[in-house]
Amino acid sequence: MEKPSFSLAVVMQRRPSASRWQSEFWEPLSVLAGYQGAGEPRLLVEDAGMQQWLHPGFKLELHRDEAEGYYLNVSAPNPRVFVFWRLEEERQGGEADGKAGGRARGVPLQVTVSFNEAGRWLDGGHSVDGVAMPPEVFAWTGEYVEKNYRPEPRKRIKPRSFVHPKDRVG
């Protein structure tokens, strides 16, 4: 059975930094829902040291075991699409040895709408940022959650005063 999926493109932004230790700052800016294109990243905007790059070809897949993470996201005040990304050196044109040179570029690697999966990426020390969830993705994810998420029933914990003294721990 094929997993539900949604095509996306990620827009990464580079802007100058006022920091003495860092000359530029990269971050995911947005995702474009339903973007069907593929291929190499392309420059969309360049203005006063700021650049925006379109990275096409992402497929947002939903998995039943992540339904709780989707529920937590769509029920939050500001639902997000989480982008797992890293800095990679730009390759110099014509280098046969494949060595990197020049500046670093922010490159998105994966996307998710699960709070839990994004948290695991962060726990692993990766760069993960959330961007606003497009309405189409919100509706699609919400529908999936309604069909597939059932919260675990809560177990009542007896207050310690009602537990027999020989069964009390501590």
Which residue stretches match the model-derived regions?
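Terminal targeting/leader modules
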Residues: 1-135, 149-170
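Amphipathic alpha-helical interface segments used for dimerization/assembly
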Residues: 137-149
